[in-house]
């Protein structure tokens, strides 16, 4: 059993790609950190746990279906969550969107009272759900997600508009319908309109603040 001094609350935030879940996670982290200090709260992006593909050629890497659960190293993520709950620090992996594989460097994370976990496929894995104290699904219409994704991937990740659209049609939308949307049933809280839903963010802040009392 986890020592009380090391108890770690895990909050999962899931939803479609570009649904606004990262914005909600970063807003909650920033505003709660101002209240309690960064020694008590941390964020783990699921994106960092894409499997290492350094053994594959670039041609093979770009063919990976990044919206399928098999693309994720959830075993490592689970191991890290359990380590944090046991009061042990972890080295978070980082992922390169331009090289399509894991970076060599990592980010050191000490145990925190609250960890915000965010990613598209979190709720598809029962083992991860069992580690969460509660979970959130950001429910944003797919057409809005597509527009946001195109803007983000072209401007921030060096992608072409054609490649973003092709990936959306081939894997992003089908995988959302097959895996991500059905996982919404496991969420404790549904947040519409993404990161612009200030009322929802304030409610979530109040809920999370209870764990610091």
From Swiss-Prot:
Annotated S-S bridges: none
Keywords: ATP-binding, Cytoplasm, Kinase, Nucleotide-binding, Transferase
EC nos: 2.7.1.48
Keyword Nucleotide-binding: yes
UniProt pathway annotation: Pyrimidine metabolism; CTP biosynthesis via salvage pathway; CTP from cytidine: step 1/3; Pyrimidine metabolism; UMP biosynthesis via salvage pathway; UMP from uridine: step 1/1
InterPro entries according to UniProt: P-loop_NTPase (IPR027417), PRK/URK (IPR006083), Uridine_kinase (IPR026008), Uridine_kinase-like (IPR000764)
Record flagged with keyword Cytoplasm: yes
One GO CC term on file: cytoplasm
MF-aspect GO terms: ATP binding; cytidine kinase activity; uridine kinase activity
Domain of life of the native organism: Bacteria
A Gene Ontology biological process term: UMP salvage
Residues holding ATP: 15-22
Localisation: Cytoplasm
Catalytic activity: uridine + ATP = UMP + ADP + H(+); cytidine + ATP = CMP + ADP + H(+)
Enzyme class: transferase
Family, per entry: Belongs to the uridine kinase family.
Name by which UniProt lists this protein: Uridine kinase
Species the sequence originates in: Yersinia pestis
Gene that encodes it: udk
């Amino acid at each position: 059993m986890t020592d009380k001094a090391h108890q770690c609350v895990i909050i999962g935030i899931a939803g479609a790609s570009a649904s606004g879940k990262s914005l909600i996670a970063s807003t909650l982290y920033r505003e709660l950190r101002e209240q309690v200090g960064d020694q008590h709260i941390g964020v783990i992006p699921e994106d960092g746990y894409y499997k290492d593909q350094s053994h594959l050629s670039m041609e093979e890497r770009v063919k990976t279906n990044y919206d399928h659960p098999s693309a994720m190293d959830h075993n490592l993520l689970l191991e890290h969550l359990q380590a944090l709950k046991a009061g042990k620090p972890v080295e978070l992996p980082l992922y390169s969107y331009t090289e399509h594989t894991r970076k060599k460097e990592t980010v050191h994370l000490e145990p925190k009272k609250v960890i915000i976990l965010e990613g598209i496929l979190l709720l598809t894995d029962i083992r991860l759900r069992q580690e969460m104290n509660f979970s959130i699904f950001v429910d944003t219409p797919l057409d809005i997600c597509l527009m946001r994704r195109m803007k983000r991937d072209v401007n921030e990740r060096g992608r072409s508009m054609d490649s973003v659209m092709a990936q959306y049609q081939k894997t992003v939308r089908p995988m959302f319908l097959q895996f991500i949307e059905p996982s919404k049933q496991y969420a404790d809280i549904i947040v519409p309109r993404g990161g612009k839903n200030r009322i929802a963010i304030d409610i979530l802040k109040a809920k999370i603040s209870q764990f610091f009392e």
